[in-house]
């Protein structure tokens, strides 16, 4: 029975007891009401707990106040606690350090509370109570030690065996006290009741924001059998952000006035809490709060067993029932990122500490499993009636009847009866019932979805869902970043939660603006044992315009694998070098099949893109950091290491797809057909920062039209190659890199109309579109581009070893570069042979084996393209372009290049206005009385008077000065003289040719700001080699059949017919076959000789050799070629709106700095067919050829077009050999009907105006044969072949032609203008070039000057002393050179006659000039593969090196040596001429000596005297003629040296004219 004390003693006793309880050590007695007795009551007002003595793990208690706390303790041991307005403010600790001396212990507080309630004996005084302090502290330390070891566990065990062993040495009184306290505590706990109202817990993570947990009411009651009942009403969790408008708070104002009071009341509080308290109570500061509701729990009822004794705080048989939970996920996503960082950091600290407890260790759990030690008496049951997640303003998720049951061995069973996904905008709900059944056993979570999951999403729902996913991803990145920053080494074997998932069929239905998308998935199965998620099939269906569902994507056999250890996949880098991709997530897909219409796909893509753009419209752009170190892990390997270096790339996820098949129906439009895309052996890697890596082993794109397949991109796989075809990389900042290898791209001109229409539509749609920041870098290696023309069947292939394309769409610039390109051509793509399976060394060899012919190469090409609102501008620079063509391949190439564009033709109704609406009176504006006598006056009667006459100079030009003519001028003649004398010409008069003909485009042509296409092509060097023979099998076969037909027809002639009557046949408009019956056997031999240069063989030739010749016949070289094209769109105008103004549709300018045509015919001794006339006055730097072509539309309302042409050509030097001329005519006149371009509406180009400058020509012509049949037919041009021209001069006069109907009429018009002019005024220059008359005319002119000059001087001054020497000097200067040249020609002619005579008598003839040696001192094959020139001669006479090292560049197997002119390699001066003359004479004498010596040697073998005489007779002509040949050659060399000494200009002329026999002249062998 309690004893009674005075009120003041009771308070003092209570104060002492409360000071022993750490929580109440700061209690003020003035706020305490005490009543001790059988029903003791304690009333506390405005209690501020001592927070310094409260130390929770990772938690710092900043403030703890209770407005009203009532404690009632009865004699029976019932403890009732009731409180109101409880506020607790805590803050997580930044560091994880804990001080064990200040740890809060619930047991310690309970012991202190119990000690104050003990019924002490009457002799008990306060001193004895003080003496008990030491023993009590020791016991408290034991309690603290035991609680610190398991303070983080769910079950709190106060009693610890280690503490019992330690306390065995304590005194007996202490043990008795301890036992008494435990009994009292156990009694109190068994009858403990508590009720708290208005409980608020504030968790401060930042100075301006905190988490507030508010509870309306908490009730704890006891039931029999140690059952506790906890009822919690209305739990609410808010995020509160404080906003203080006043920027500065005075520190002095925050401090209390009474320092002692401050020390007693606020000593344990931080400066923040003092400031917060001051803010809350200071009326001068306006405090606002931004509050977000995160979680609301309506009513919770918790029943548990435990807390029965002080020795056992275990909680078991826990039964939790929750009525309603409301979670605002959208408010959670609005929390500040820094605040979320602090929350995650605090949670990580708690998780880390809980993992460090002994019971959570791996060893303890293994010990628990091995010994079958499970806490079977603990049970947990959780029931939640309703859970609502407010995901977004449009989305909410409702869960009903959630049940969790814990069974034996810590196994849990979870049931979720119903899930409802609500669209708050349309009030549509998706209900899934029964929804989920889950099991948790041994850290394995098994999820079984019990019904089919059919989801339905509308547009607003999808937008909200995407936005939520993005925000969630942002929060997860924040969490992962925080987690990785505090990441500790992972303990091996630590158990993580494992999952197993099984679903029914899953479908997602998305409603867009005008369509639905339905995604159907087979059951999803995930097994944690294999770490694989498997889906057998996924189907994507669409019903555009709300029509019938149509399947367009099918995904087969999807397997997603998760691995704790890195998975390595083989990949390739940008250099196609092997590397490794490393990941822990691998997705394998067997097949993806896509079938859809293209226009539907565009609509679907637009709808999806609109939703994505709207969902991400308000998202701020995230700045991506450069991360490169984590992508490549390399190891430095020394030379001695045997490890093979392999680059490694890290990836978040790798997707492996065996096959991708895509088909786009009605691609672009119905005319295109279907587009089929195929990808095999694909690998896709998803990296950080949204980087993507992809490779494909094979790639193909085909066009499918009317069941016929047209390849657009095909893969060229070599059997030896394992490299991928395509590598794709998406980098940060919208950078795309594409690497392509071993593919063939096809260009079809027939697709241009479709693409042009598509491009027009895209321009209309994207006219207002903004430029995107996109960078594309494409590297193409070992790739072929096939060009297919519009109407004909040939194909041109360009093979690139390496092609680079870079595009910057922000700047609208594109760059293309390739170093080497090879050109191949075929006459019919259908004749291409089937490729063999044998590996090929190069791509060019692959196509050569399939029937293509190599026609050229192109090197170092750079293309720059720039686009803007005005149009497209492209600039192309090419270092060199080389072509090797035959007549048929040249014709094929030209037709193909023309046919690569769209053939645009129009009917006459669209081109011309053929109907006149009404009669036109042509005399309507004619003054019929203009020429009446009344209007005609005599010239003498003309008087200038009355008014001043103003002559305006700007009438013809832009001058604005006016000249006033005085009235006093009486006559026109006097006026003219006075005007000339008064106006002196101070500046030279500048005359502008063709001023009147100049067209002012500003006044006649309509220019507007419109789109244009500008193309500029610069080629430094173009080499075109023209070969004889034919590339195509069709051509060769046609010619062979024609030759055989002619042979058969002429053999069928009767015997009495004329044997010399010829039979003619023409094929391909250029090949003329003629033979007679007597010469039919030599027909094929002559053809071989003309084409291949083969000598006439002895024997029958079964087949003519029409293959391309082994060496080219003519070489065309062009240097610094510039082509500038500017095109404007053809804007169709309505006739009523047309102003009948002209419009320029396109303009082409072609400029060639220098060009030459090299003669390499075996029968020609001349070198340059066409070159620059060096000695004419032509400005330096002016191009040899310049032209301009303008295509104009005279009337805008009509489609008729006309051409304006202008040519400017430099003076030309021509060396024309008849054989070369015949070859060029035969080459360029070749026409194959297979390549004729036939338009729907044939049109002849009308040339509105043609202008050309005056061209001077210096002509050398060497005829070889005369066509007498042509003469008999009336072809007078054959008379030219009777004369050899040497330096004939003629001039093609400048001309202007108007209204020419086509190029054939242009040729006739030029002939009609130039021929009469040459005949009438230039015959002197031509006759002066006739070879037999040239020297005589020149000498005659010199003799004429010898006489005329003295006579002229005598008439002037009457003296002859000075005029005669002057005339003699002129005569010697002009005639001496001609005399010398005439002598040299006579000597060379004599040498040629002697060589022919010697050859007639069995000598070597002209072949004796060079001595063939068996050794090949120069391998021409190494210089040029196509020419294969072999042979040469390098003679030595008595150890003297020859003057010139001779190469016979045209000598072939079964071929003839090239004919070299006697005028080639002339000595440069007199000294060199005499030296060459000496060596020539010596060499020929040595030849004669060897001939006689060889005959003498053979005479010893001969037995018959007759044979000896015959042998001597054969040797005699050679011995006699060969020295004469040497003498004439020596004389010729000496005279040539003298001639070149007198005239140095002849040296350059001879180099241009004659082929050189020296090795220095490499043009003919390159």
Swiss-Prot record:
InterPro entries reported in the protein's UniProt record: ATG2
Record bears the keyword Endoplasmic reticulum: yes
Catalytic activity, reaction form: a 1,2-diacyl-sn-glycero-3-phosphocholine(in) = a 1,2-diacyl-sn-glycero-3-phosphocholine(out); a 1,2-diacyl-sn-glycero-3-phospho-L-serine(in) = a 1,2-diacyl-sn-glycero-3-phospho-L-serine(out); a 1,2-diacyl-sn-glycero-3-phosphoethanolamine(in) = a 1,2-diacyl-sn-glycero-3-phosphoethanolamine(out)
KW Glycoprotein (keyword) present: no
Any single GO BP term: protein transport
Region feature (Disordered): 137-178
Chain intervals with Low complexity compositional bias: 142-162
UniProt-recorded name of the protein: Autophagy-related protein 2
